[in-house]
Each structure stands twice: as structure tokens, then as C-alpha cells.
């Protein structure tokens, strides 16, 4: 069997995922698409609007992703694709989250015994 990762580029960009949780998988079909692009794809595929436009939330604490992040996915997606973010404090927050969470996208470091024996 195979496990499909459901994270998208927007979530990955700011680390809004759980390592070995929702970010786990053998293939990431949405990994190079922003939230806005995923929504467009959903519409193109004819998915019900209530699913396509559902407010993103982790379902754990009653607040939305955007409330927790402090900016909208539309703002984030524009910054990812065009490099444009009109609010300097939001741009700094996005850059900070991206830098802090890049490790989530990297393979697990492995111990290399050869380097210790040289």
C-alpha cells in the first residue's frame, strides 16, 4: 500500500504541518500547489463548493489556520508565487516561519560511521 501526503505548498512553506503526521506519505500530489491553486483544481474537478471553500482548520482548538498564522492563505500564496506582500510585518512573519520550519521538508539526518572513523 501507499500513503498519500495531503499537505500543499502553502502549508509546507510556513511549516503548518506535523512531521510524521499529516506531512507523512509516499507521494505528495498537492505539494507544489498553493491553497489557491488547490481550490481552483477542486473547482475544475467539480468538487462541491462547500468542500472547496471550507475554512482551513486543524480541528483541534476551534480557531482557523489563518487566525493562528496571522495572515490569510491568499496573502501567503501571492508572496510565494509573486514575491509580493504589502504588509512588512506579515512578510517578516512568513519569512521567519519559513526559515524556522524548513527542516520539516528535509530527510532525516543519518549517522555516517565512516566519517567518525577517518
Predicted stretch roles:
Residues 1-2, 7-118:
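ATP/NTP-dependent adenylation/nucleotidyl-transfer catalytic domains that generate, transfer
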